[in-house]
Amino acid sequence: MARCRMPRWGLLLVLWGSCTFGLPADTGAFRRIFLKKMPSIRESLKERGVDVAGLGAEWNQFTKRLSSGNSTSPVVLTNYLDTQYYGEIGIGTPPQTFKVVFDTGSANLWVPSTRCSPLYTACEIHCLYDSSESSSYMENGTTFTIRYGSGKVKGFLSQDMVTVGGITVTQTFGEVTELPLIPFMLAKFDGVLGMGFPAQAVGGVTPVFDHILSQGVLKEEVFSVYYSRNSHLLGGEVVLGGSDPQYYQGNFHYVSISKTGSWQIKMKGVSVRSATLVCEEGCMVVVDTGASYISGPTSSLRLLMDTLGAQELSTNEYVVNCNQVPTLPDISFHLGGRAYTLTSKDYVLQDPYGNEDLCTLALHGLDVPPPTGPVWVLGASFIRKFYTEFDRHNNRIGFALAR
């Protein structure tokens, strides 16, 4: 087995685990990537006593600056401060291992590079891609920048063999040379593997999943995502080529995507106690596997939070007294003619580092101006309840009640 280039702070690898790559077993009809659930960056900051209110304000200011963007600096709505799930992939020959977030909100693959500047301390505690250790590396050199709500990454493009779920493709990916300290210093993942559409990719790069589809090795042109609600067991799983019945019950209900080249669908309202409170005239929603929370326009969230009796603790972060949780009402999201209902157990976070008297809600305000927004985001808090299938062949998203 090959290893990724060890960070220069070798001792810190104890905290982040080994960089040794092992391929998952070929399960026949499906190809699987097992996911591990981790504390989010926000949780890690809270554990260390860091006031995260300022980070929320920074995210809010970022969304206010959003515009149509351009091909060299695309806008990605995912806020990795709250991302909790990652899986392993291999890059190079022999493969170097990286822990990545599988993110339907973006379309590029990037990992930190050995060419990362020593000034960027966040690189020091992650596995670094070393092109000199790979016999299949091909130089590209095109520079790129990707802006996220929680920072931006810069680097250059390279080409190498990438192995995902036992499938190997020739892939152009990003070697990141500028990785911001906040938030990536405390990230348990090394990089991001975008599962979005080609239109979302920086630099005209063909996404990993499209290269996999071109090989014709999958039974269906779909992938599905399961996030476990039990943190003591398997964190989750990405299934390439289909959906696994052991993770859901009943049948899938499908909703066609509403925007070509994006995992975006229409929502017909958000209701509490059978009353539609917001999005009465319909609104757009992105199903984002890289996001943890459910986000929506600030004005809509505040109305929803007032109904729940929640208070705004910091910028767009809401809490309730923990003794209120059992009496909080259900929240329903109306998609494709059906109501997808979350109970308080689904939308209240278990925060072992926070105030024992206050419980954080997995709902955030997110103001995105036109033409990108306004938009809602359904992240892991929703996907944990509803097993989700992303169907590229039919341009639709399917939901089924998770087991």
From Swiss-Prot:
Listed GO biological process terms: angiotensin maturation
Keyword Secreted: yes
Enzyme kind, highest EC tier: hydrolase
Pfam families according to UniProt: A1_Propeptide, Asp
MF annotations from Gene Ontology: aspartic-type endopeptidase activity
Active-site residues per Swiss-Prot or TrEMBL entry: 103, 288
EC number(s) per entry: 3.4.23.15
Any one annotated GO CC term: extracellular space
Keywords: Aspartyl protease, Cleavage on pair of basic residues, Disulfide bond, Glycoprotein, Hydrolase, Membrane, Protease, Secreted, Signal, Zymogen
UniProt-annotated glycosylation sites, renumbered to this chain: 70, 140
SUPFAM superfamilies linked to this entry: Acid proteases (SSF50630)
Activity modulation comment: Interaction with ATP6AP2 results in a 5-fold increased efficiency in angiotensinogen processing.
InterPro entries given in the database record: Aspartic_peptidase_A1, Aspartic_peptidase_AS, Aspartic_peptidase_N, PEPTIDASE_A1, Peptidase_aspartic_dom_sf, Renin-like_dom
Disulfide feature: 116-123, 279-283, 322-359
Family listed: Belongs to the peptidase A1 family.
Its biological purpose: Renin is a highly specific endopeptidase, whose only known function is to generate angiotensin I from angiotensinogen in the plasma, initiating a cascade of reactions that produce an elevation of blood pressure and increased sodium retention by the kidney.
Subunit structure: Interacts with ATP6AP2.
Stated name of the protein: Renin
